[in-house]
A protein has these predicted regions:
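Glycine-rich, phosphate-binding/catalytic loops in enzymes
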Residues: 98-100, 198-200, 227
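Beta-strand secondary-structure signal
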Residues: 38-40, 53, 69
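An acidic, glycine-rich "communication" segment
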Residues: 216-241
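Hydrophobic/aromatic-rich, well-ordered segments within soluble, folded domains that form packed cores
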Residues: 53-56, 182-183
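Short, surface-exposed linear patches
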Residues: 102-106, 185, 203-205, 231-232
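Aromatic-Pro/Gly-enriched surface loop or interdomain linker
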Residues: 1-29, 51, 58-174
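A general secondary-structure signal for short beta-strands and their flanking turns/coil
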Residues: 34-36, 65
Length: 241
């Protein structure tokens, strides 16, 4: 990308958009956004595997922006498979204001037990630890954690594919298409199926590199969406034994 770290894959709009409601919070602090669709998009078949950032902006307020990250899962065989830590992104996500899996803004001590759920159906707001950078709003932890390694790997010419935590949970065959799984920086929240799939692949010869700290620390349990019934749209942390 000539040092730019990425390239423009496409653009669209403008779109007519209204104010979407902030969903009510359940007893487990779960907020699920059952919003009206402003626009939809089908990923073209010729797009390569990668981590993409859709940047949303307002035509009436220049400079107001937010990202929407998404992963195009690898379909081809690659030497390396970089897994983004999207479950950890959501665990620390404080959208709409203070509601991460750790706290609700009511006290100085973080909660580390069970019985708190977070939904994947909500935007990424401010990340509740380490970094407060308005220009990264909406990107989860990607620009903080994954991007520096991805930038370097692609600049060095490595053969890289990409997947999300959710891909590893739902599709063990994603590991059949690579020689090595790479976990980056802060990959804290894993499901049992993720762990079992990675372990089975390792026993079959897959290499696994954890270029990270605090990895595979919390086991989670997935739940179906309370609004659509779609599987694996919310999760809770299991109690540490």
């Amino acid at each position: 990308y000539n040092g730019a770290g990425g390239r423009l894959a496409g653009s669209g709009g403008p779109f007519s958009a209204g104010t979407q409601p902030v969903p009510m919070m359940t007893v487990e602090r779960l907020r699920t956004c059952d919003w009206d669709i402003t626009a939809d998009f089908t990923i073209p078949d010729d797009w390569c595997s990668g981590i993409y950032l859709a940047k949303l902006g307002r035509t009436d307020k220049p400079g107001w922006q937010s990202y929407v990250p998404f992963v195009v899962k690898t379909r081809e065989a690659t030497d390396l498979l970089v897994q983004v830590s999207d479950l950890t992104w959501q665990a620390y996500n404080k959208w709409p204001a203070n509601d991460s899996i750790y706290d609700d803004g009511s006290g100085p001590v973080w909660y580390s037990g069970p019985n708190v759920r977070v939904s994947l159906d909500r935007p990424f707001a401010r990340y509740c630890q380490i970094l407060d950078a308005p220009l990264s709003i909406g990107s989860g932890e990607f620009l903080l954690w994954e991007h520096p390694l991805v930038f370097w790997l692609e600049a060095q010419g490595y053969d890289v594919g990409y997947c999300s935590n959710l891909d590893l949970h739902l599709d063990s065959k994603v590991l059949d298409r690579t020689k090595a799984l790479v976990s980056v920086a802060h990959d804290e929240y894993w499901s049992r199926d993720m762990f079992d799939n990675a372990l089975a692949a390792r026993e079959d010869g897959l290499s696994i590199a954890f270029l990270s700290g605090n990895a595979v620390y919390h086991e989670i349990e997935f739940y179906d969406s309370e609004t659509t019934g779609e599987p694996c749209r919310a999760f809770a942390r299991r109690e540490l034994m």
